[in-house]
Amino acid sequence: MTDEGRPKTPAAITTECSLIVEQHLNVEFYRESRAKFLSTCDDYALMMLVSKDHGNKFWFSIWEHQIDWFENQNIPNQYFTLACGGSDLMFLFPVALFQSWKEDLSSRIYPKNGRKYWHINIKQVSGIWNLQTKKEFDDISLEEFQIGEK
């Protein structure tokens, strides 16, 4: 169980998802930790986050320490992958793009450790998968980042 009392995603699911990303990028990864993958060619870093299906909505958190991990890598191609309920629906996007979205997203400081995290809420609206932003901003379409077929 995590600190919040929720069970962790089984490692087999993140591995299955990483294999699909390998095919999509035509690169081979090895696992550095439960969610972190590096390519054997040293050109790619990948963070694999998995959400349960919450009725056609998916929730994630991206933490400051996860961004710090990317910043400490001397690797040109850095990606987040958001796996929505498993490997059938995933969104793959560059970390640099997430950096440009951060101000539009809700964030919080976790009181137990003082770390900042961003709320990542994905919802399908009128057939389009969107990253939901704060009310004063337009939601971000994730269609161009979709891999998988849900």
Where are these regions (language model features)?
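Acidic-basic catalytic patches of nuclease active cores, encompassing PD-(D/E)XK
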Residues: 1-42, 52-53
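Exposed alpha-helical structural elements
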Residues: 8, 12, 16, 20, ...
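Structural alpha-beta junctions
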Residues: 22-28, 73-76, 103-107
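Glycine-centered tight beta-turn/hairpin loop motif at sheet-sheet or coil-to-beta transitions
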Residues: 41-43, 86-87
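Short hydrophobic-aromatic micro-motifs
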Residues: 45-48
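A broadly conserved detector of short glycine/acidic/proline-rich loop/turn motifs that flank catalytic sites
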Residues: 50-52, 135
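Catalytic cores of nucleic-acid endonucleases
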Residues: 53-90, 95
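Non-catalytic C-terminal interaction segments of nucleic acid-processing enzymes
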Residues: 91, 96-150
